[in-house]
A protein has these predicted regions:
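Conserved phosphate-binding catalytic cores of ATP/NTP-utilizing and phosphoryl-transfer enzymes
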Residues: 104-112
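A basic- and aromatic-enriched beta-loop-alpha substructure that forms the phosphate/nucleotide-
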Residues: 99
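Conserved "HGTGT" condensation-loop signature of ketosynthase/thiolase-family condensing enzymes
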Residues: 1-96, 112-119, 123-237
């Protein structure tokens, strides 16, 4: 291939993990992280060589460490714990900041590091087990997902408040409320009325549901037509 940039960052493996748990099973986030990491390593075709070459692990901050605690506790060093569970160690450990932007932000940042030559190979991993925590709470089971560590890591937790006084004053105190404002701002920018915008969004999400129809990891498996997504029937919410 001509004009190939040998320093260009390339994603060489991806992995996903989920499971339907049964009574008596209480998998922690690091259990799911382990399965996802192993799947990603296998996806590279050279799992052992890649695992050894990884010098950076970036873990996406869990809900437990984002101010939405379910009382399970968490490892002192989540990137280290997730990596170790998947058989990977690294000299550089990053625990990403709060927010849904973190997965893509970490991919972007580490791609830049690879391009600049400050990172050879990186692993980005995130895992949650909120279903386990909720089942345990209902069953009266106490879970302890803490794991001691004194290893240093880059803790990206910001000190800025997630909500401003203006947002609180106007009742914008949850993400769904903020999202609805953003969607309406987008609708106005596109000069669409409510019905036209709903049709456009229903068509978009119907296309996503084609993937959900065949995915083993889909929370709501099955195809949903645009008409079904615009209705208020059959559990649509």
């Amino acid at each position: 291939m001509r004009n190939f940039d040998a320093g260009a960052p390339v994603i060489i493996g991806v992995g996903e993990a989920s499971r339907k748990t049964v009574a008596g099973e209480w998998p922690a986030p690091r259990d799911f992280a382990a399965a996802a990491i192993k799947a990603a390593l296998d996806d590279t075709g050279q799992p052992q060589a890649v695992a050894v070459a990884i010098d950076t692990i970036a873990a996406i901050r869990t809900f437990e460490d984002s101010g939405v605690s379910l009382g399970t506790g968490s490892p002192d060093n989540t990137p280290e714990a997730f990596g170790a569970a998947g058989g990977v160690t690294a000299k550089r450990l990053i625990y990403a900041d709060v927010g849904g932007q973190s997965p893509q932000a970490m991919v972007n940042e580490l791609a830049g590091d690879i391009k600049r030559g400050t990172c050879e190979m990186a692993l980005v991993v995130g895992a949650e087990a909120t279903g386990t925590a909720k089942r345990a709470r209902k069953a009266g089971v106490t879970l302890d997902w803490r794991l001691a560590s004194d290893t240093e890591f880059d803790n990206r937790l910001s000190s800025f408040p997630i909500l401003s006084r203006t947002e609180i004053r106007h009742g914008i105190i949850s993400m769904p409320l903020a999202y609805s404002l953003i969607e309406n701002a987008r609708r106005m920018a596109l000069q669409l009325d409510g019905d036209a915008y709903a049709q456009q969004m229903a068509a978009l999400w119907s296309a996503f549901s084609i993937k959900a129809e065949t995915s083993n990891h889909a929370q709501f498996p099955g195809f949903r037509s645009p008409e079904a997504l615009q209705s208020y029937d059959n559990g649509n919410y």
